[in-house]
Structure formats: C-alpha cells, structure tokens
C-alpha cells in the first residue's frame, strides 16, 4: 500500500538577533582564540562563559517575536473497505456475476476523521484483467443518491481523469481539495464506459449504493436505475490533517463489519466508537477505521482472505495507524463444526494467530488492543454452536485477559453477555440469531471501550 505523502505547511521563523550561522561562527572563533592564548584553567572558564552566552542567544529564538514551529500536513486513513472476491463461492453456491457498462456508480462512505483534502484508494487486487475507471468525483452526501453539488470535486490520478489498474494493482489518487467533516458521509461517483466486471469489492456494506445509466457523475441526485450494498473497487479514503490523530484500525469479522445493523444508519460498532471518542476532548483527534470482513476467520479463506494473510495489508497498511483493535476467532470456532473435515481449528491455533498479529503490530510501533470473543450460545446457524466450541471460546478469552504482551484488553464479552446465562448474548443486545448484536449491542460495545487505552 502506498505510504502517505507528507507535505510541509508553514515556515519556521528565526529572530533577526538569533542567526544560527552567526552563533556557530562566534563559537568557532572564540574556541580557536582561546585554544591559542589561554592556559587550561582560564580556557575552561572562558568556554563555560561562551556556552552560557550561547544558551542565552538560543533562548531568544523562542521568544514572543519568533514564528511558531512548522507543522507538517500528512494523510491519515478515515474509511476502509477490506477487499474480497465478489465471485467467491460459499456454502456450495456462488453469486451471479456482476458488471457495469456505460454506467455511473455512486457509493456512500461514512468517514471518521475530517481533513482539508481527501484521496481515494482504488483496488483491482482480485481482478484478473485490467480495470478502467473513466471518471471519478467526490462530494458530500446529503442522503440517498443525492450530493451537495457545491462540494462536487474531481478526483484525478497523476493529473488524469481516467485511470487503468492492471490485474492485482492498487492506486492512490491525487489529493482532492475537498474539506471533509468528521463523522460524515461522502459520495464517490465513478463512470465506467465499457463492460467492467465487478470482482474486487467489500461485500457487506450495510449501505445503499447506486447506479445510473451514462456519465452522470456530477448529478445532484443520481437518476438511479439500481441499488446494491457492496463497495466496488474502493478500498480506502485518506484525509489530510496538520495535527496527528490517533488512527485505530478495527479488525475482525461480521461483528466488526456491522452485520445486522440498520442499513444507511452507520451503526456498526466502529461508527459508534468514532462518534463517542470524538466527543472526548481528553483523547484528542481520532480516526476509527473498519477493517472487518463478514464471515472472516484467522486460519481459512472464505469468506474473504483469512485473517492471518490480510492483517498486514488491511490493518498495518492503513495511513497513519497508531492502534489496532482485534476481534476475530468466533468463526474459526463455529465453522469448525459447521463445515466439512479440514476446517477444524483449535483454541491453541486461534491464540497463536492472535499473538502473531499482536507481535506484528508492536514490531511496527502500533499499539495492539485485543477484544474478548462475544457469546454465541443457542445461535440459529446449524452446527455452529457446541459445548466444545464454547470451551474454545472460554480458553481464547482467558488467554486474551492474561496476555501481558497485549497493550490493552477490551471486554466485549462482558459488555454483551446475559448475566443469567453468560454463554449467551443479553436479549436487549441480540439481533435475533443469538450470534450478532443489534444496534443497541453495537453501541454497548463502543461504550465498553476505555478511552484511557489510547493515552
């Protein structure tokens, strides 16, 4: 993944009386003169006097007449959609192939941090042929397929409006001069002129996205001909800031991805967490980025690339990352009983995968936070829950709580469990399948996060 391009803003000023070159010259000449003319004791006293006077000269550079230190503008991740294969088969079936042809596709992304510029990351990581996007625009979303037309902004790639990605490639756009508000929605509109297969996507959008005939990327209200809930080709948005926010990348499965949350409401737990932390001045600026994939597992592909294989790209590759919050493992447990032989995963394998991710994060200077796996007793999915699976979950959570190498534990199990039946989700937080939280459950997860972990 392309690293963020840092751009300098502002200039460091020096007081006219504090020329550093003049100071160096004074010290050099003073030392030369004293070395030639003074005995050792007097030389020491004279050197001390020069050091003290030099300190006084340096100190004047910090006075009220000098300019403030320069600030550096850099890009930080504010939205992500971890890539998957649209055509990936699951449970014996595969979706019908999808493509766009002479159509505009408008996708709505709910960002966390704001900034004064934005750039778009496109991906053809899973495609097997070149991908051409003929035109791209970005604007504030005002609901549904509508945009604030006054904010409609072109997105270019090396100054060109059209971009072609080779199979397996990703590309980062030029910075677009759009001011982005925190915890708001942006609309990214693409035009594809020719038949364009949809392969690289983020499948679980929980967001209505739109398509229309022809090139209408700047339409204030898209004349919609179809809707969908996946994110095609777009895997990230970064914003430029002159401060340095904490960037928390949440990593996990459907519970991170927001399965069952209200469509178009942005009630995934990372959304709730972003809004909650934004209201806490003691924490400072924050960006909460979602790298969940519904159905994801540590040890096996389907659905999506396995967690062990995608952690570095989808988490550590995010611009400006400072923290990761890991919640993954329930599907390794549940699918052990639901799938054919060869899918069995032990508690020891799950804890080893967690430890490996923690070690990778810490080696990059990223704080590794790990969440306990949430209850799933009585889930409606055939073969998913078992007493043996529950024993694995308990063992993994014990490992997490007792692991001293983890920078912080977030106890999502405690936040969601039914006190009368600790292996099950509390009824008020249960989506109804006894595995996934509802909107209130996702809010409870965000409220369980201790902001002090970021400080």
Regions found by a protein language model. Give the residues of each.
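N-terminal secretory targeting modules
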Residues: 23-30, 36, 60-251, 256-257, ...
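Structural recognition of the beta-strand scaffold that forms the well-ordered cores
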Residues: 119, 247-252, 256, 286-292, ...
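Alpha-helical scaffolding within the catalytic cores
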Residues: 232, 270-277, 303-319, 352-356
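Oxyanion-hole/transition-state-stabilizing segment in secreted/luminal serine hydrolases
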Residues: 261, 293-349
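Catalytic His-Asp segment of secreted/periplasmic serine-dependent ester chemistry enzymes
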Residues: 297, 334, 373-455
């Amino acid at each position: 993944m392309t690293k963020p391009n840092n751009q300098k803003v502002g200039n460091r000023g020096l007081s006219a009386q504090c020329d550093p070159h003049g100071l160096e010259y004074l010290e050099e000449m003073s030392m030369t003169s004293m070395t030639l003319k003074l005995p050792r004791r007097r030389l020491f006293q004279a050197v001390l006097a020069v050091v003290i006077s030099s300190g006084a000269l340096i100190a004047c550079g910090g006075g009220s007449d000098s300019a403030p230190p320069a600030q550096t503008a850099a890009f930080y991740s504010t939205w992500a959609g971890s890539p998957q294969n649209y055509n990936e088969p699951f449970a014996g079936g595969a979706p019908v192939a999808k493509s766009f042809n002479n159509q505009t596709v408008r996708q709505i992304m709910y960002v966390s941090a704001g900034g004064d510029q934005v750039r778009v990351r496109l991906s053809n990581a899973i495609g097997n042929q070149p991908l051409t996007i003929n035109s791209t625009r970005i604007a504030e979303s005002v609901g549904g397929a509508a945009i604030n037309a006054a904010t409609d902004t072109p997105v270019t790639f090396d100054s060109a409006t059209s971009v072609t990605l080779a199979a397996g490639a990703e590309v980062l756009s030029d910075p677009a001069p759009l001011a982005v508000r925190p915890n708001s929605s942006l609309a990214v509109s693409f035009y594809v002129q020719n038949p364009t297969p949809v392969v690289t996507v983020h499948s679980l959008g929980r967001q209505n996205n739109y398509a229309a005939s022809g090139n209408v990327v700047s339409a204030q209200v898209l004349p919609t001909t179809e809707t969908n809930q996946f994110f095609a080709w777009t895997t990230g948005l970064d914003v430029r800031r002159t401060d340095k926010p904490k960037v928390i990348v949440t990593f996990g499965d459907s519970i991170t991805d927001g399965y069952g949350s209200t469509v178009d409401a942005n009630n995934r737990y990372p959304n709730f967490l972003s809004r909650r932390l934004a209201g806490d001045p003691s924490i400072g600026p924050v960006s909460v980025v979602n790298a969940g994939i519904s159905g994801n597992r540590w040890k096996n592909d389907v659905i999506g690339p396995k967690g062990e294989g995608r952690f570095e790209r989808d988490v550590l590759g995010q611009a400006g990352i400072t923290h990761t919050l890991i919640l993954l493992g329930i599907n390794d447990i549940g699918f052990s009983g639901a799938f054919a032989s060869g899918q069995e995963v032990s508690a020891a394998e799950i804890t080893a995968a967690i430890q490996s991710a923690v070690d990778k994060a810490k080696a990059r200077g990223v704080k590794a936070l790990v969440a306990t796996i949430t209850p799933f007793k009585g889930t409606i999915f055939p073969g998913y829950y078992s007493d043996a699976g529950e024993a694995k979950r308990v063992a993994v959570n014990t490992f997490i709580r007792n692991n001293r190498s983890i920078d912080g534990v977030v106890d999502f199990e405690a936040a969601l469990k039914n006190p009368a039946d600790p292996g099950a989700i509390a009824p008020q937080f249960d989506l109804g399948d006894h595995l996934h939280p509802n909107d209130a459950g996702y809010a409870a997860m965000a409220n369980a996060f201790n902001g002090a972990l970021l400080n």
